[in-house]
Regions:
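Nucleotide and nucleotide-moiety/phosphate-recognizing core
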Residues: 2-7, 11-93, 97-98, 107-109
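Flexible, gly/pro- and Lys/Arg-enriched active-site loops
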Residues: 47-55, 71-75, 79-187
Length: 187
């Protein structure tokens, strides 16, 4: 089944820039997903907490093995984030981070799971704020336009809906800074 992830970074870690952190994250995700396709990298103004650096964002789509559950994927994502310098215990919610990986879609699953004991286990799919995030919608539409034959038909069926969401949010402040082909050479 097709999994769609949104990736973002706006805080260098060790000697790595935000783009280098995205490259490292995609390399790690290759162990979890097959037939990976990725968008270009876009720069966008921060949302929610605006007093921080601009983000580098992209979307990755790939096929997950049937044995990989959404919660297993979430656990693996948290390990990747931690390995790339993300420390959730010390960060401001929606503040700067070395890497952020969100599950936007997991096939056609709809999940709404909340764990008050361990908020890191909470999961909502599709991502609940997709409709307000042009920095996810623009790269997602890029992938759908480039690889319609390789994308789950359920996801492709929502293309018009994504385009309508983008009309509402607008695309101001989201600028392509590295095309997918150039990014691919680094991965």
């Amino acid at each position: 089944m097709t999994v769609v992830l949104g990736l973002g970074s706006n805080k260098p870690w060790q000697q790595y820039s935000s783009i280098e952190l995205l490259v490292k994250a995609v390399r790690a995700l290759k162990a979890l997903l097959h037939d990976i396709r990725f968008s270009s990298v876009y720069e966008s103004a921060p949302m929610y907490v605006t007093d921080q650096a601009a983000f580098c964002n992209m979307v990755v789509a790939g096929r997950a093995e049937d044995s990989l559950s959404p919660h297993d994927l979430l656990d693996q994502i948290h390990k990747i984030e931690a390995s790339l310098g993300r420390d959730r215990s010390r960060e401001i919610r929606n503040g700067p981070r070395s890497i952020d990986i969100d599950i936007e879609f997991f096939g056609n699953k709809k999940i709404r799971f909340s764990d008050s004991q361990n908020p890191l286990k909470s999961l909502e799919i599709p991502h609940p704020r997709l409709n307000e995030r042009p920095f996810v919608l623009i790269p997602l539409l890029e992938i759908l336009n480039k690889s319609a034959d390789n994308v789950d038909s359920t996801l492709y069926a929502h293309k018009e809906e994504f385009m309508q969401m983008l009309k509402v949010t607008g695309s101001d402040g989201v600028v392509k800074i590295l095309d997918a082909e150039a990014f691919e050479k680094s991965v």
